[in-house]
Amino acid sequence: MYNLSQFKARDPLKILAFMKEHSFVALCGADAQGKPVATHVPIFVDQVDGELILSGHIMRSSDHHLAFEENPQVMAIFHGPHAYISDSWYTKPDQASTWNYMTVHASGGIRFTDQQALLEILKRTTDHFENNPDSPAGFNKMSDEYVHRLSKAIVAFEIKVDNIDHVFKLSQNRDELSYEQIINKLSEGDVHAQAIAAEMRNSRK
């Protein structure tokens, strides 16, 4: 990881908040032979008894499920906004164009849970994203037969996080005028550029 101190958050709560906000992750690992695998899943980020736990579910017997059973060391990559930064936006020339971005890498051991925990994560996931207790797609509206059939195809997991690294690269190494010019230019860009501009404004408050 791009590991420079000026691109690190001073407050660990900001890292946790970022993870919860950007919780559709790339979950990566390797099988026993070292073949890399990855999948993309929504997860929950919880603090339990002083430990950080990531939980979710994946398709049963997929290449990544089988690989994670062989080798439980995994990494969840949390992706945030990102945007191109042009050299022409700096007050001084020849400083090199670059990319601003925000990401967190959380690694640890994955374990697959029992049937009861699977039902709990199914309910939590469905109710969280439906966000409506009266939704016809809510967990409490699912038939027992459907839940039973669905649970045969997936498996729930928990990851006990033992290491977190992050990069919040937001032009912290630029002079004040360049910083403001970068924000102004990004504000004219697409949704990703505008999101980086907002993060840059907030980081200087």
Regions found by a protein language model. Give the residues of each.
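An N-terminal domain-start capping segment
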Residues: 54-75, 185-205
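Short, structured beta-strand-loop surface elements
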Residues: 61-121
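Short, charged/polar surface micro-motifs in flexible loops or helix N-caps
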Residues: 32-35, 46-53, 60-64, 80-84, ...
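Residue-level recognition of well-ordered beta-strand positions that form the cores
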Residues: 42, 57, 77, 109, ...
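An N-terminal domain-cap segment
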Residues: 1-53
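N-acyltransferase acceptor-side catalytic subdomain
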Residues: 3, 20, 68, 158, ...
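C-terminal edge-of-domain segments
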Residues: 113-205
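A generic structural signal for short beta-strands and their flanking turns/coil linkers
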Residues: 23, 39, 50-54, 70-74, ...
